[in-house]
From Swiss-Prot:
InterPro entries for the chain: FluMu_N, HeH/LEM_domain, Rho_N_sf, SAP_dom_sf
Region (Disordered): 53-87
UniProt cross-references to Gene3D superfamilies, sorted A to Z: 3.40.5.80, SAP domain
UniProt-recorded name of the protein: Mu-like prophage FluMu protein gp35
Assigned protein family: To phage Mu protein gp35.
A GO term, aspect molecular function: DNA binding
One Pfam family cited in the UniProt record for this chain: HeH
Assembly information from the UniProt record: Monomer.
Amino acid sequence: MDKTFCVVVQNRIKEGYRRAGFSFHLGDNSLAAVSESQLAQLKADPRLVVQITETGSQEGGEGLSKEPAGSDEQKQLRADPPSTDLNTFTVEQLKAQLTERGITFKQSATKAELIALFAPADGEKSEA
């Protein structure tokens, strides 16, 4: 009988960051069944913010099949792009995001210039 935790992990590093057997999207990630050892690994990573939402005990993995709403939440998290405030990123993180998206920029660009380069890439949301 393992003790499991429901946690929310905030990833501000990059899309697809991996730790403790999980792949994280940018922003908040809700995890339904995290073991004690996985929780310790997540908490040990200074690049992640971990918040425990619930604790419980599981016998053999039955918890996931009993709660289909948790899997729906997980699908919704992955389907909706995370809402991030670009001003919270450092210049290096912005440069990494632009490089991943294939957007070219000057190495001497300021933070404001780098943020402005995201606008054409996120052109779907033109209405306020």
